[in-house]
Regions:
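General beta-strand structural signal in soluble alpha/beta enzymes
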Residues: 47-50, 109-111, 148, 246-249, ...
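Active-site-adjacent loop/helix segments that line or gate small-molecule/cofactor pockets in enzymes
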Residues: 1-37, 54, 72-74
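PLP-dependent aspartate aminotransferase-fold enzymes
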Residues: 93-213, 230
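Glycine-rich loop-to-alpha-helix module at the N-terminal edge of alpha/beta enzyme cores
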Residues: 19-20, 46-135
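Generic structural signal for well-ordered, non-membrane alpha-helical segments
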Residues: 6, 10, 32, 36, ...
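Residue-level recognition of short loop/turn positions
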Residues: 41-43
Length: 271
């Protein structure tokens, strides 16, 4: 295999796998070793890798992280109480909210992936939408809309995919289950007028906006684009006025772009 040129070698290595990303996004080299921002390829190249949207800011093979992960951690899932659960929760509470003096969250939910996390968040939103639109609810009988940002990406499972502008057109074109789905309204990031217009349209057409989904630092769809505080404040204001929930989806790109776990610690968002 190593006698092949690098592009042939790469194709041979991945021929047994389905790659659902665009061919142009596949890296044109094969890493042999990596540390920090540096990669050595199988064919002798030295690559300086500044990192993609999902890369931790610590670079490749960070010594402290790898050392901690290699230790024995006695912890099962949430059905089995563990001392490590308490240790982990205390660590989260110290980290999340460290710029504002205290953690603003009472409890945490741990999921297996970003897409599953968004699915659970949207399930919570779904419960609220049911309460709002059921008989005797404040928005009884109204059509339900969701609002998300143009070029956003929230996952490839069903509901997260339905609010992911970056890949939704392909799903609508190819998937029967996405045929006719039209209850999502997309807004250009940081377009306050556009956001207000969606809520005006909802009021005029008798719809209830169940959710505003936002990435504070955008990932796959528009890597690195950040929310303005003014746009965020307007979204919160509209949500409070209409009984809408806010979903802040900060899983990979947020850590990479800001170096912290939650928007509550981003510069300008500490309050």
């Amino acid at each position: 295999l190593v006698s092949l040129n690098e592009s042939q070698f790469a194709r041979e290595l991945q021929k047994d796998f389905v790659n659902f990303y665009e061919p142009s996004t596949v890296n044109p080299y094969i890493p042999l070793a990596a540390k920090g921002p540096w990669i050595i390829t199988t064919h002798g190249a030295v690559v300086h890798d500044n990192g993609g949207y999902g890369m931790l800011g610590m670079g490749h093979d960070p010594t402290e992280v790898m050392s901690s992960m290699s230790k024995s951690h006695v912890m099962a899932n949430v059905m089995t109480p563990s001392v490590t659960h308490k240790r982990f929760a205390d660590t989260l509470k110290r980290e999340v909210g460290h710029t504002r003096g205290a953690c603003p969250f009472d409890r945490f939910i741990c999921m297996n992936s970003g897409s599953e996390s968004v699915t659970v968040a949207m399930r919570i939103s779904d419960i609220n939408a049911r309460l709002m639109t059921d008989q005797e609810g404040p928005h009884q009988g109204k059509e339900i809309w969701t609002v998300a940002l143009d070029s956003g990406f929230h996952g490839r499972t069903d509901r997260p995919a339905s609010i992911s502008s970056s890949c939704l057109p392909k799903y609508q074109k190819k998937l029967a289950s996405f045929r006719g789905k039209s209850n999502v309204r997309f807004v250009i990031p940081n377009d306050i007028h556009g956001l207000k217009q969606v809520f005006s349209d909802a009021d005029r057409e008798g719809a209830f906006v169940e959710l505003i989904a936002m990435e504070p630092v955008m990932g796959e769809g528009n890597p690195g684009l950040m929310l303005d505080r003014e746009f965020y404040d307007q979204a919160i204001s509209l949500a409070n006025q209409h009984g809408t929930l806010i979903l802040i989806d900060s899983i990979q790109a947020g850590i990479r772009g800001q170096g912290c776990l939650s928007i509550v610690d981003y510069p300008g968002f500490e309050d």
